[in-house]
Amino acid sequence: MSINTTVSQPAASSALKRLIIRHPLVAYFVIAFAGTWAFLLPFALSRNVNGLGILPFSIPDIALIIAFVLATPAGPALASLAVTAITSGKAGVGLLLRRCVQWRVGIGWYLIAIFGLLLVPLLGYSVFLGVNLPLALLAHSSLLLTVFLPQGVFIILTASFAEELGWRGFALPRLQQRYGPILGTVILGTLHGLWHLPAFFTFILGPFSFPGYAGFLISAIALTFLFTWIFNHTKGSVLLATLTHACSNGAQNVLVLLIPAQLVVSGWAAPIVNGSWQGVNVISFGVCALLLILFTRGRLGYQPERNVQLIEVPRPAGAPLTVEVEHSGRS
């Protein structure tokens, strides 16, 4: 009995590794969701503000803030590092981490990463409100130093770097390789949006409503097209993805201070926009995504040869090519 026990543990571990190697994307998303939701679900199910009240207790708000700060990086970062280590070893982890400091890209891409996700919704709000919000921002340029910059730095330190290590660092190259840039982007945006779901049952992103969450999810998908476009033009730089992510969060906080709390517009957009700033985001980022698809002919800057280099570890010259063969058990 003891012999079977000691043998079965390594066998189970080996079987799990083979499963992860065979399905790295599925493994990544399962671990990413589990690593984050394990922190957030107790709050979402509790009697806290916006919680579902299924659990018969409430948890101090400070605990939620700490859990949120820990949960945001825990899932995607640990998932990307764990799956990469299993599928590609130390060399693969090293390749992934080197892309986190890939800074040699054109200055224009830095400007797009920093200001792009601020200008797109600003232009959208300008159209719907009939106000030149870019000029309004210039008139209140101090917001860039007092809100935009501090928020961006805070998000980099607490969330965006760890998140992007997983979403763009690990998942996006593999999704593009398997499904192409458009479908791969839609899948990533959808799963990224769903990953946030428990936070909508807390005071951080709640209260939950189907229209509000649907707007968030559609915006997340549309926004992911801009991320993919930047990613593909910056040699898969996780650093630029991190910067884009952080500045998008900072941009939303600036917009809150520049636009009315309740939006009222007329015309075709009224059912989407009225009473919800999220509706403007849906339209603004949706139009941006469609334009990117149109002008890049659906490629979003995707280059298969370069994308492969983001996934496969270079083989040393003269090293034998090893291929793992899956045996069916038939002789």
Kindly give the residue locations of the regions a language model identified.
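Membrane-interface helix/loop boundary segments of multi-pass membrane proteins
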Residues: A162-G189, F203, N232-S237
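Juxtamembrane helix-entry segments on the extracytoplasmic side of multipass membrane proteins
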Residues: A136-V153, I204-I218
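Aromatic-anchored segments of alpha-helical transmembrane domains
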Residues: F33-L41, L118-S126, G189-A199, A246-L255
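C-terminal membrane module of polytopic membrane proteins
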Residues: N48, G236-L239, L243-S331
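N-terminal membrane topogenic signal
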Residues: L16-F29, W277-V280
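Alpha-helical transmembrane segments
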Residues: L25-T36, P73, L111-P121, G189, ...
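Interfacial helix-loop-helix junctions of multi-pass membrane proteins
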Residues: A199-F210, L258-V265
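Membrane-helix interface linkers and caps
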Residues: S8-I21, F43-I112, S126-S141, I230-G236, ...
